[in-house]
Amino acid sequence: DNKNAFHEIESLVAEYPMDSRYQVVLGDVYMQNGKKEEAYNMYRKVLDAEPDNAMAMYSLASYYEETGQKDLYQQQLDTLLLNKKVPSETKLDVMRRFVVQIEQDGKDSTRVISLFDRILEQEPDDAGIPMLYAQYLLSKGMNKEAFPVLRQVLAIDPTNTAARMMLLGEAVRKEDYNDVIDLCEAGVETNPE
């Protein structure tokens, strides 16, 4: 029941005023119950105190989307995904949700590709986002565009067997045996088993 949920979250916010997680959750509960202004105010309060709070950034982006403010939604999503202080795992989770949403809505993949490209310009130190991007490109039949991204995955994480195997399969298909040898030798070096 909603009344108890509100009471419980509000009491946690009062008990732990410095823990922004409860404030964001309260904003989310407000949003789920049609209290959009209260939700917005809670997200803004958290972001005023902690501008790099990924949970609040994502919730605010969701708020903009649900209230039909598409430009602000995209801007907030960019702020979250292009912020170097947001952990890679959080960005990866947000991108997964974004990709699923775009696919479910039947929207043009250029938005997804453009956002991935902008994230990768930051030279990620984690192979998760480039790997997700490569998988997305492959799912769209954009193999030519996916293979350089897979090479980027290997540059970040030489032990990434999935990326190496996809590249190896493509090299065999193209009968590029020099590339096959290079990929295999590098694979044995990084993964002797």
Language-model features: where?
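Alpha-solenoid helical repeat scaffolds
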Residues: 1-193
